[in-house]
Amino acid sequence: MANFDLTNLAVKMICPNNVVKTDDTDLPSVLVYIPKFKNSDVLTGGNDSTHPAFIVNGVEIPGFYYGKYQAKVYNSVAYSLPGEDPTASINFDTARARCEAKGAGWHLSTNAEWAAIALWCKKNGFLPYGNNNYGKDSRESNYKAVPSYYESGKIARVATGTGPISWSHDKTMAGIWDLNGNVWEWQGGIRLVWGELQILANNDAADPDNPQNATSTCWKAINAADGALVDPESKTTDSSAHVSGKTVKLDYVNNKWTYSTSITNAKDESRSCAFYQVAADSSIGDAAKVMLRALALLPDSDVTTDVYEGDYMWWNNGVAERCVSRGGWAYGASAGVFSLDGDGSRGDALTNLGFRAAYIPEIR
């Protein structure tokens, strides 16, 4: 038996849902398997449809493999490895390329996949902690991870997987690490164009054959009445928003983000509210709300208090295109698995902005 097979066997003996997977470079990444489930398995207001993370190009998949660790790039290829300073200062398109360089099935984490994991965490009663306060979680005083990068004399990033067990998504060694803080993580398959929410269908963003460049025709808007995916009203080449009253938009009303078919308050700046405060007005139908909740973009139907432990959502609805990252950075309780930053240009390359790779073997 090869040394790699022994390594994989040893990992699976300790963490049965983990796998050490080599890519086209014959180098390993550690992945966590997420099996298929329905919206109703993780959402009070969910239907019995398969969660979108488990549908690619119209075909259901049994599950997906998610990077156990934030990505580290070596020789222009992304890896999921413990004890590494996660690669940051990387823009959206380059992050995608570093994941796709691993070979067939490999891709940048998609928002659908991130949402599936976040909703699973919430349903199972545990939202992971992480490096959101200079090397530690703002709610923990005694735990710190191994520093890997400093800014202004303070710990900015920590080595992947070196935090306490509370930094794992399922609070075990078998879980996914650092989903809360450390670096924001780019997510594929979602953007905002002049305030209009645009996505790729289900988890189609996992397939590199479905382009995500600024002018790709794979981008779709959401019909507010029935949740169907339709051609967008607004394009990145437009000079302002196009609003017909049919597709889902993001409006900023009474200092909180509200899904609507109209935009009464558009600004080219980052504005925020607590995730539990995000709302949908009467123009958004039930099917569209289920889709938004399944993508961890709207609180569950029974939420009236901050059960998301302070996670925040930022958007910019007054500019041609903004891409999305999730998880947070040095924002204390505002960081977390439901935290979202929708104010990033696809060209942004910041020291607090990284990514994570995922793998679906059915994509060839």
Protein language model features and the residues they cover:
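A generic secondary-structure boundary signal that marks alpha-helix termini
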Residues: 75, 126, 192, 362-363
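C-terminal, surface-exposed recognition/capping segments
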Residues: 1-4, 139-157, 162-166, 170-179, ...
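Charged, compositionally biased non-catalytic regions
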Residues: 1-18
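Amphipathic alpha-helical scaffolding segments
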Residues: 113-116, 190-194
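Short aromatic-cysteine micro-motif
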Residues: 49-179, 208, 223, 256, ...
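Short secondary-structure boundary/capping segments
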Residues: 122-127, 191, 200-202
